[in-house]
Each structure stands twice: as structure tokens, then as C-alpha cells.
Regions:
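Single conserved hydrophobic/aromatic residue that forms the stacking wall/gate
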Residues: 2-7, 11
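Short active-site neighborhood of thiol/selenol oxidoreductases, capturing the structured segment around
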Residues: 546-570, 574
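Short, ordered, surface-exposed loop/turn motifs in non-cytosolic proteins
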Residues: 67, 75-94, 115-116, 423-454, ...
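Short, internal strand/loop/helix patches
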Residues: 589, 600-615
């Protein structure tokens, strides 16, 4: 578990302090950190220091900890100074860096963490090495940095999380009852607000009134939730058939979150985008306001005023002139934006300085304002211009007098194909849930390839079958495939496979999901003759046993905490596996603690749950 020091909904809705997230879950934490303004001189371990804040390690406030020292050696046994040491935690099927340190003159770096396992990855000048570190068991660890990219091999890791160390405070019946009353009041406020959102029925009525596509309008307005008035205002302004098609396309290009907070000013600004010849490129890479993770702004109108007509026409005719202008005029200072949120394109124009990511967003935004199709590649993170021949990488760091396309325009690519032998209950591994791909950088570190994860409510996303079964194109280079099987104990059986992609060649590897001999582990006793009362709309309200309802064999039983975040997250996760669970065909019994709780459950909030559920 990795966390920053922020309270959660689970914590705030408990009857007493330290009952929710900050107790049992936090006791299994590996690293927690927070930021303190200015230079901090306290007892906590310092993670990093910036001109405005100090980041400190506060894991000791929440979980038992241990300190470990890592010594990085080269292939001859000599200590390596100034090597990058990354402490990695298995999370979402990748080894995610939770702390990054530099070795001292003796090749040493240290970290204090919860008593579980991490992967330590050391790199410098293209060489790297790695080893598993068990905090609490390994007080010293030597990492031999003797590997270079290019060699194909695989290594297995079993990573064990810290044990739970819960110290639950007592809760009196009076405290529980008082908290239940508060939750009823809070839920009434929330439900009163949610009741004002547009439903499928009201959205379709609006669509018919304004002669818009009913299905598209319904999806958009229901998804916009509390921002539906802005979306309705925008749609009502779409008069011609062309503008109606364009407006709906624009709304379907932005993310679900954008629909919930985009402003009318932004939508109107981007509806007036300049045209380019390729209609598909215009929809995806010109009119689309979303570049990366920035706050959406009406930047097209801004640049129309800020950039002269002559310059805009020159950039459109020769986009590399825009690359040269940005490389020469926008100074990159990664310390100027310590908060991390991207600087707006307008802000970059005015300041002429930005962090590298904000600079990249600025370039794409400026290009789109001039009808030059451009994007930041969602998988690799590279800035690209889009032409009839495909996507071309541009190097905004190159010498401004000699701007060129990287790899002479289009990067050389090969193909990756992975075979997979299904294990029980998993016939199609999912990206982020079961496997990830990362590219090795020239320095020796790893950069995740960020494929589509799908939508928690709608499913979809990247899987083995739609990415690797028939093969996918990758830039030439060295890569790592990480797979992981999570056990009931929380431990992970991982396999890390190193491989190389050559230009115009196909690389074939095997995607392996490791299994435990004790895959189904007994974690408690369960009486399948236990009785429950189905809700009236389930067909029968007569009490029956779980065995009667589900039959023998596998089934799932869950107890719902109504309107609580852990339950809501779990239900959305279940909804994303609707097709798989219905194909499995076994029953799922979701229980409520009592009739009062059952009455508060809004089933319409989770429309995509499997049909195999019994409430």
C-alpha cells in the first residue's frame, strides 16, 4: 500500500476516529509521505527538498517499519556513486517507483518502509541491476549493476505485503446510532443534489425537442451529471445539421470527467476551430480540446489573437517552423512548477517558461489552434504531428537552428506477439490488472506504456487478446513485460520478462500468469446453510439458504455498506467484469445488514451489474 497523508471518505464517515482507512488498511502500508512548506528540520526521514517544500516520510505514524540500506556495485564489485536507486512497489501490474534516491560516494542509499517486499532497481549510464528487498528482514542489500539492455531473460519474484496490525477502537451503540443518523442526513443532501441530474427520459425529451441524436444526447447528458446545464446550453446553440454533428462529436471526444466540469466558454471556443483537409484528423487532433491531463481552457481564441495571421499561415504551411519557434522561445525549467499540475497554454505563452510536460501541451495546443493536427501519444508520451503518412515524432529539445523529426520522421518499428496459456478462471489477462509493458530508457530505467484502461462503469480496455495475441507495433528498443497474480493473502507471484524489438522484425514471447499450488486458500469457515431474505423484487421473499439459492460449487457472497465508497468502488469493478461473470454463470448474493439499509440502496446507480446477482 502506498498513500499520501490525505483523509478518505471511508475515514470521514466513521463514528469514531481511526476506525476506517487509518487503521487496518494503513497498518499494511509500505510508504506514506507528505509535503511540508519550506525547509523542514524534524525527525522524519526526508524524501526530497525543493525551494518551496520538503517531502517527508511519515510511514512510522501508521505502520511498523524497518530501515534498509542499499549498496550499488558495478560488475567488478566497486561502489557506484550517483546511481539512481528506485524503490518499486508492485501496483496495477507494474513495479511502480514509490521512492527515488541517488547513491552517495560509497554507493549507498537508504529508505524506511513498512515490513513488506519491494523491488530495488538501480541504474546509471545505460547499465542497471535489480534485487528484491524485504524490509524487516534485509537490513543491508547489495545490488549489482552489471546488466545492459538487449539481453533476453526472465526472472520470478514473490512479493509479500506487510501483515495487518489492526488496533480497532471501541464503538458504543450510541456512537454507532448517532453516526447512522449523520449518514442519513448526509445521504439526503447528496440524493437531493443527484435527483436534479438529467435522466435518460429527460435527456431524450431534450434531444427530440432540438432534433438531436437521442442515443448520443442521452449518453452525454446522463454522464455530465451536475454539469448538465452547461451541456444543455451548448447543445441548444447548435442550429445547423453540420453544427449539431460537430457539437456532438466534440462532446464525445472529451473524457467523462470533462463532461462533468467543462465550461460553456471552452466548448464554444473549440467549436470555432479552424478546419484542416483531413476530416478525421480535424475531429481527433484539431477540434478536440483535450491534449493530456491539463485543465481545459479556451486557448484557440487566445492564440488566434496572440499569433499574427501571417505567422499562423507560415506555421500551417511548414509545421517544423512552429517546432523551431517553441524550441527557441519556450525555456524548460522543471523546477518552476513544483505542484505538478500542467500550466495552461495561455500561461506558457505569457511566461515563456514551463516544465517539459506543460511545454509539450502548449505546443500541441498552439498547433491545433492553427489547424495543424498534433497530439501527445497516449502510450509513449511523445509529441507528434499527424499527417497523411501517419504520426511523426518531433523533438522540442533539439537545437532550434536544426529542428528535425526524430528518426527522420517516423520511428522504426517492429512487432510484438505474445502467446498465452490460460490458467483457471483467467482466459484473457487485462492490462493494469494482470500485465504491463515498459520500455527501457537509455539511462537504464523503465517507462510504462500507458494503454487504454477502459471505463470502470462500461468495461473495455486493453487485454492480451486485443493487444498481443495477433501482435502490436512497438518502436525498436528494449522492453520489459511484467505479469502478476495476486493471492488471497495479498502476496503477488510476478514474472518479469526482458525482450528486444528489432525494426521490421517480429518478436515472440510468452505471457505467463504464475499460479500457486494453494491458489484457493482457506481464510475462514463458512456455513452455506445460512439463511437470508431476498428482496421482494427478486421473485420470492421467503427466507432461504445460500445453498438453495446458489446450488453447490462456487458462488460469491458480499455484504454491502450502502453509499460507502469501498462498496461503490467494488460494485463498479464488478460491473466492469459483467460479461465474464455472466459467462461464468455462478450466482452472486449481495446482502444488506438489515431492511433499513436495503431500502437506501439505489440500484439505478449501478445499471451494469451482472444479471446473476441476487439481492
Amino acid at each position: 500500500l502506498l498513500a499520501s497523508s490525505a483523509a478518505s471518505d471511508v475515514y470521514k464517515r466513521q463514528p469514531v476516529l481511526n476506525l476506517g482507512w487509518f487503521n487496518a488498511p494503513a497498518s499494511r502500508g509500505m510508504l506514506m509521505h507528505t509535503k511540508v512548506f519550506g525547509r523542514y528540520e524534524g525527525a522524519e526521514e526526508v524524501m526530497s527538498v525543493t525551494p518551496t517544500y520538503t517531502e517527508i516520510n511519515v510511514i512510522g505514524n501508521y505502520a511498523p517499519t524497518a530501515k534498509a540500506t542499499v549498496t550499488v556495485m558495478d560488475g567488478h564489485g566497486n561502489p557506484v556513486s550517483d546511481a539512481c536507486v528506485e524503490f518499486k512497489l508492485y501496483n496495477y501490474a507494474e513495479f511502480y517507483t514509490v521512492a527515488r534516491k541517488q547513491t552517495d560516494a560509497e554507493g549507498k542509499a537508504f529508505l524506511t518502509a513498512g515490513k513488506g517486499d519491494m523491488l530495488v532497481w538501480a541504474s546509471k549510464d545505460g547499465k542497471f541491476g535489480y534485487a528484491k528487498l524485504s524490509f524487516g528482514k534485509d537490513h543491508e542489500l547489495v545490488v549489482k549493476m552489471d546488466k545492459t539492455a538487449g539481453g533476453g531473460h526472465a526472472v520470478d519474484f514473490e512479493l509479500v505485503p506487510p501483515p495487518e496490525n489492526a488496533e480497532l477502537p471501541a464503538v458504543t451503540p450510541e456512537q454507532r446510532a448517532a453516526n447512522d443518523r449523520r449518514m442519513v442526513h448526509e445521504d439526503s443532501i447528496r440524493n437531493a443534489y443527484v435527483s436534479m441530474f438529467m435522466t435518460d427520459e429527460t435527456a431524450r425529451y431534450f434531444a427530440r425537442r432540438y432534433k438531436l441524436d437521442e442515443d448520443a444526447v442521452s449518453r452525454i447528458l446522463v454522464a455530465s451529471r451536475g454539469n448538465h446545464r452547461v451541456i444543455v446550453d451548448f447543445m441548444a446553440r447548435l442550429r445547423s445539421e453540420k453544427s449539431k454533428r460537430g457539437g456532438l462529436d466534440l462532446l464525445q471526444r472529451i473524457s467523462a470527467k470533462d463532461l462533468r466540469d467543462v465550461t460553456l466558454e471552452v466548448l464554444m471556443d473549440h467549436m470555432q476551430s479552424r478546419m484542416c483537409k483531413n476530416a478525421d484528423h480535424f475531429r481527433r487532433y484539431v477540434r478536440n480540446p483535450r491534449v493530456s491531463n491539463e485543465i481545459l481552457t479556451p486557448y484557440k481564441g487566445f492564440f488566434k489573437k496572440a499569433v499574427s495571421k501571417e505567422d499562423a499561415e507560415a506555421y500551417k504551411a511548414e509545421p517544423m517552423k512552429l517546432v523551431a519557434w517553441v524550441a527557441q522561445n519556450i525555456r524548460v525549467d522543471n523546477d518552476c512548477n513544483l505542484g505538478g499540475a500542467p500550466i495552461s497554454p495561455e500561461g506558457v505563452w505569457k511566461a515563456r517558461v514551463a516544465d517539459a510536460h506543460s511545454r509539450d501541451i502548449f505546443f500541441v495546443s498552439m498547433a491545433r489552434s492553427m489547424a495543424i493536427p498534433a497530439r501527445i501519444n497516449g502510450v509513449t508520451g511523445k509529441v507528434q504531428l499527424i499527417g497523411d503518412d501517419g504520426a511523426m515524432d518531433v523533438d522540442l529539445n533539439h537545437h532550434p537552428e536544426e529542428p528535425v523529426f526524430m528518426a527522420e520522421g517516423i520511428a522504426s518499428k517492429g512487432k510484438l506477439v505474445a502467446s498465452y496459456k490460460p490458467i483457471r478462471s483467467l482466459d484473457n489477462p487485462k492490462y493494469y490488472s494482470h500485465f504491463t509493458l515498459s520500455k527501457q530508457t537509455p539511462q537504464g530505467s523503465l517507462q510504462l506504456l500507458s494503454y487504454d484502461e477502459g471505463d470502470a462503469d462500461m468495461g473495455g480496455g486493453t487485454t492480451w487478446s486485443n493487444l498481443l495475441k495477433e501482435g502490436t507495433a512497438l518502436e525498436a528498443g528494449d522492453y520489459v513485460l511484467v505479469t502478476g497474480t495476486r493471492l488471497a493473502s495479498g502476496a503477488v507471484l510476478s514474472k518479469t520478462t526482458f525482450f528486444n524489438i528489432l525494426p521490421e522484425k517480429t518478436t515472440e514471447i510468452e505471457l505467463v500468469m504464475r499460479e500457486s499450488e494453494d491458489e484457493v486458500q482457506v481464510i475462514g469457515n463458512f456455513n452455506s446453510e445460512s439463511l437470508f431474505t431476498p428482496l421482494p423484487d427478486a421473485g420470492s421473499a421467503a427466507r432461504q439458504s445460500l445453498l438453495q439459492a446458489c446450488g453447490r460449487g462456487y458462488f460469491v457472497v458480499g455484504i454491502l455498506g450502502v453509499n460507502q465508497e469501498p462498496t461503490n468502488h467494488a460494485l463498479r469493478d464488478i460491473a466492469s467484469f459483467k460479461a465474464d461473470l455472466e459467462k461464468w454463470g455462478r450466482k452472486m448474493v449481495l446482502l444488506f445488514p438489515n431492511e433499513a439499509k436495503a431500502g437506501k440502496f439505489a440500484r439505478e446507480s449501478f445499471p451494469d451489474l451482472p444479471s446473476t446477482i441476487i439481492y
